[in-house]
């Protein structure tokens, strides 16, 4: 249907229809009807931001258990990552809790860390260490374990982990 000489009454393909596009099945702009490659291959690679550390059960000597919980993100790429609209989730008891949506303009430099703290006390405690600190808007971490997920602004999972309190 995308060819210039498309004939809806045709009953066989005589090879005269040329549909220019991408023939690489791994590309975002792949078109299964393409008959001629136009070298427009388009790939999308998610930034390499990982959930690097989860501090889910701080010692009570620090104060309230929830105050000092955090998760640490790390950009393992060699370029800065734009985290605008990214979302961090934690799942406890089968319920997915939205913990943070990153504001527009949030970036994480190559090789840099970022801390997502559960409370204002955590933001204060971890904020002076030379990296960005954000306060999560809901939830805290389960001491017995749960699933954590970092998703891009379109809901694609960038990184996800499961942790538990059992010995390895």
Positions of PLM-derived features:
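Primarily marks secretory-pathway-exposed extracellular/lumenal segments that are disulfide-
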Residues: 1-50
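Activation on beta-sandwich/Ig-like modules and their edge loops
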Residues: 44-168
């Amino acid at each position: 249907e995308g060819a210039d000489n498309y004939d809806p009454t045709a009953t066989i393909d005589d090879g005269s229809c040329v549909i220019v596009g991408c023939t690489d099945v791994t590309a975002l702009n792949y078109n299964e009807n393409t008959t001629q490659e136009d070298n427009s291959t388009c790939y999308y690679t998610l930034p390499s931001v990982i959930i690097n550390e989860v501090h889910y059960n701080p010692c009570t000597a620090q104060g309230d258990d929830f105050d000092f919980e955090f998760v640490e993100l790390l950009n393992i790429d060699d370029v800065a990552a734009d985290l605008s609209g990214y979302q961090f989730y934690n799942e406890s008891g089968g319920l997915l809790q939205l913990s943070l949506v990153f504001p527009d303009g949030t970036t994480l430099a190559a090789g840099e860390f970022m801390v997502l703290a559960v409370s204002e006390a955590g933001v204060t405690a971890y904020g002076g260490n030379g990296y960005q600190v954000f306060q999560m808007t809901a939830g805290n971490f389960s001491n017995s374990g749960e699933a954590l997920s970092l998703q891009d602004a379109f809901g694609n999972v960038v990184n996800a982990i499961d942790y538990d309190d059992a010995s390895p």
